Amino acid sequence: MTSTKPAPFTLPELSYEESALAPYISAEQLKLHHDKHHKAYVDKLNDLVGGTALGKKSLEEIIKATAKSKAKKTIFNNAAQHWNHSFFWKCMTPTRSRDASIPDALEHRIVRDFGSVDAFKEEFVKAGVGQFGSGWVWLIEDGDKLAILATHDADNPVAQGKLPLLTCDVWEHAYYVDYQNRRPDFLKTFIDHLVDWSFVAANLAEKKSDLAA
């Protein structure tokens, strides 16, 4: 029997082909990650909140409302993982059209807060490698400073009231098909070859625009 429970959330389509991130992320890896793992979080979230008051809220509102609730931990985990993955896909851009340069305003902030772009990249990779077990590594704006944040499991900056600019998924399902247990190689490849720096810069610029409004 087909369920009639409302499904307020949907799996976002990728803005690029499954093969577009090759040779750094294979079509097989991306399809498994997006179509199976991400979809499972969306389906579970809909099952948990469909037809409830939470189901009428935005994803960000659900995350903030459930972040500190032990009773709603499962809802938080699935809502946050849906948000995290949706953001992660946008952090990457097809290799054939990628502009490897970092926009000037963003580069200025990175150099100011980390010393150099290379130092930032090294710290980002180190934080991801050092994340014990499953989680995410983020570039965030905390106050007026850029910082790197590693979060466990589904946790994210939205739940902590911080602005996410960039993320990399360090759950094994994000890289195991292509990199097996070589998380350092995956992280270095991500930061050197896959990041859409224009998207990262736009996240920072959007915050400034909001403040000026």
Description of each model-found segment:
Residues 1-213:
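Feature for soluble, non-membrane regions of globular proteins
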